[in-house]
Design a protein with these regions (language model features):
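Glycine/threonine-rich flexible loop motifs
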Residues: 29-35, 60
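Short hydrophobic segments within beta-strands
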Residues: 6, 23-24, 103, 188
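A short loop-to-beta-strand scaffold at the N-terminal edge of the catalytic core in hydrolase folds
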Residues: 1-12, 20
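Generic structural signal for residues in well-ordered beta-strands
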Residues: 3, 50, 215-217
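Short amphipathic alpha-helix adjacent to the substrate-entry channel of hydrolases
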Residues: 34-53
Length: 249
């Protein structure tokens, strides 16, 4: 597989390094483009590098690429994000290997929570915005109930999933790896989210709490993107404060 890293010219001091935010997109069948993004500029102004990842399954690389992810979520996409992180760290010495954190929403939140559980020693903190944490419990409460089936590689059942279906979904979910998590996690949840029901965040929060993990949760009177101006401003500022605190910046 051939992959590429596009990055801006380094303008920092020689020999210095910056913390890295790894930010997988949602969807999963969407794409990150190189257009101007205020959220990236916000974190860059705070001294972070930002790595966006178009993992296999993203749009713009052909139908076979899109379909390659079906049945492989929680594995192929997670591995791609992790490999992209390692490639960036190996090729860009201005990135601090001991200060790698995660951000992502929806399926990006699915990947963020997966990465903290599958690679607990690399990622030091994570912010998950309306994350999918359990495909099995999401199947009955999302406004797109076929999503959990299709992404798990299953045929959509109009009536109800079988126990075997639910076991397959759970096996591909971040909650499977929750006991391995070491990184502090901030969950940002929209109470009116119809796409990823807020119970996904609540379930993960209470499970982390029960395990004695470090977790915080902010809940907003908002929907899937948490896009109302006052709410978006709040979660961005709180995300920065959370990451700074746990990286001791």
């Amino acid at each position: 597989m051939t992959s590429y890293i596009y990055h801006y010219q380094w303008h920092g001091r020689a020999g210095s390094s910056v913390p890295l935010i790894v930010w997988p997109h949602g969807g999963p069948h969407s794409v990150i483009t190189t257009d101007f993004k205020t959220i990236v500029m916000f974190f860059c102004q705070l001294g972070y590098g930002v790595l966006y990842v178009n993992y296999r399954g993203s749009l713009g690389f052909g139908e076979d690429n899109v379909r390659s992810l079906l049945g492989r979520v929680g594995d192929q996409d997670v591995q791609d994000c992790h490999e992209a992180t390692l490639a960036a760290l190996d090729n860009l010495p201005q990135l601090a290997r001991d200060k790698v954190v995660l951000m992502g929403g929806s399926h990006g939140g699915f990947l963020v929570t997966h990465l903290t559980g599958q690679f607990p020693d690399l990622y030091k903190a994570a912010v998950a915005i309306n994350p999918v944490t359990n495909l099995a419990s999401l199947a009955g409460v999302s406004d797109i109930p076929d999503w959990s089936f299709n992404e798990a590689g299953l045929k959509y059942k109009y009536l109800h999933p079988t126990p075997e279906n639910l076991a397959t979904m759970w096996d591909k979910s971040p909650i499977k790896h929750i006991e391995n998590i070491k990184a502090p996690i901030l969950l940002l949840i929209g109470k009116k989210d119809l796409r990823v029901n807020p119970t996904q965040g609540y379930e993960f929060y209470h499970s982390l709490k029960a395990l004695g993990k470090t977790v915080e949760m902010n809940v907003y009177e908002d929907n899937h993107p948490i896009g109302k101006f006052e709410h978006a401003l709040d979660w961005k500022i709180n995300s920065a404060l959370f990451l700074n605190k746990h990286l001791r910046l």
